[in-house]
Design a protein with these regions (language model features):
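Generic secondary-structure signature for well-ordered alpha-helical cores
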Residues: 16-17, 49-53, 83-86, 97, ...
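Terminal amphipathic helices with adjacent charged low-complexity linkers/tails
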Residues: 92, 99, 139-174
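Mobile "lid/hinge" segments at catalytic clefts and subdomain interfaces of large enzymes
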Residues: 70, 77, 82-118, 122-124, ...
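Structural motif
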Residues: 42, 59-62, 87-91, 131-133, ...
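Short, glycine-/Ser/Thr-/acidic-enriched flexible segments
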Residues: 26-28, 48, 67-69, 95-97, ...
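Conserved thiamine diphosphate
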Residues: 21-24, 49-59, 104-147
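Cofactor-binding active-site loop characterized by glycine-rich and histidine/acidic residues
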Residues: 1-84
Length: 174
């Protein structure tokens, strides 16, 4: 909805107007054609580096779901983001869902962070050198606005970990 695809989600006759993935032919906000979000953090690192080399300003934002975090490219992107420095916002959409069952140390840490409302001493993102903000209700627009206002001028990469409920507000999906 934030990238100009609102009609496709609100009106049945427009459902087929979008691919469901990043596509520059669908939105000026998409810079790459990709099929999975494990690539989002690495691609955002490249955009942030280019912005910095050109002496430009502005936010670069990567969005990645919890189900995509275990992808090798996602982990490489997080590692590089910590070294890159500069403004980079990494939104982790944690709805505790993925195509396959979430398991392993990373998902245990995400659960621990959810259970402690982001206050766990053992924080995967902080241990990598990234700043971290937790949003308990990622379906709450006011909470999201507050979180993004707090990080928009960050001078180093920050993870905004939002816990969402997939389909919230739409009875058939809840």
């Amino acid at each position: 909805m934030l990238t100009g695809r609102k009609k496709a989600y609100l009106y049945e006759e427009h459902y087929d107007d979008v691919s469901g993935y990043s596509n520059p032919n669908e939105s000026v906000h998409d810079h790459f054609t990709v099929g999975h979000t494990s690539t989002s953090v690495s691609l955002a690192c490249g955009l942030a580096k280019a912005r910095d080399l050109k002496g430009e300003e502005g936010n670069v934002i990567a969005v990645i779901g919890d189900g995509s975090l275990s992808g090798g490219e996602a982990l490489e992107g997080l590692d590089y983001a910590a070294e890159l420095g500069g403004n980079l916002i990494i939104v982790v959409n944690d709805n505790d869902m993925s195509i396959a069952e979430n398991h392993g140390g990373l998902y245990k840490n995400l659960k621990f962070l959810r259970d402690t409302e982001g206050k766990a001493d053992c924080n995967f993102f902080k241990s990598m050198g990234l700043d971290y903000v937790f949003v308990k209700d990622g379906n709450d627009i006011d909470a999201l606005t507050f979180a993004f206002e707090s990080v928009k001028d960050s001078k180093k990469p920050v993870v905004v970990h939002i816990v969402t409920e997939k389909g919230k507000g739409f009875a058939l999906a809840e």
